[in-house]
Amino acid sequence: GVPAVICITKIDLAQNENDQLDASIQQCAAEYRQAGYPVHLVSANNGHGLDEMRAALRGRLSVLLGKSGVGKTSLLNALQPGLGLRVSLVSQVTGKGRHTTTQSELFELEFGGSILDTPGVREFGMWEINPDELPGYFPEMRPYLGHCRFGLNCKHDQEPGCAVRKAVMGGEISPRRWQSYLRLRSEA
């Protein structure tokens, strides 16, 4: 698969007057790190985390993917000053982005590597994923798969003897990530 890196943008909006980050953002980042994903907290406005993000992108072909208005193009402008790519404010009426980026464009990065800026995604969903394969897409669940009472037939929901549920209850898997898995499974 393609290695994913999570970049939480606009963190300046979640900082208090002492530059301390909101606890819910810290918790979310910690949960994804525990699951094995690199997580970067960045701000295009104040420059926080940009050097670490450049290091993560250096020498790679990367794609910026996310909903409209999350700051993908603003991040790219901050990572490589001088690009001057057009950005818009989030709509005050709808609270959503305005799809300023209308087509994907590949940029060579002066610090090494290249990055594809993409239009905002309107909706994320499941496509042709077998519900029984879904647990394998959650790295933190993989060590427990096959160790349930019902083996690989376990849905990891309410079944007795579920190793995944035991790991959730024991704090080894984030309850929020487990709930996300259950929500996706119900959509599959």
Over which residues does each language-model region extend?
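Conserved ATP-binding TGD loop and adjacent catalytic N/P-domain core of P-type ATPases
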Residues: L64, N77-P81, V87
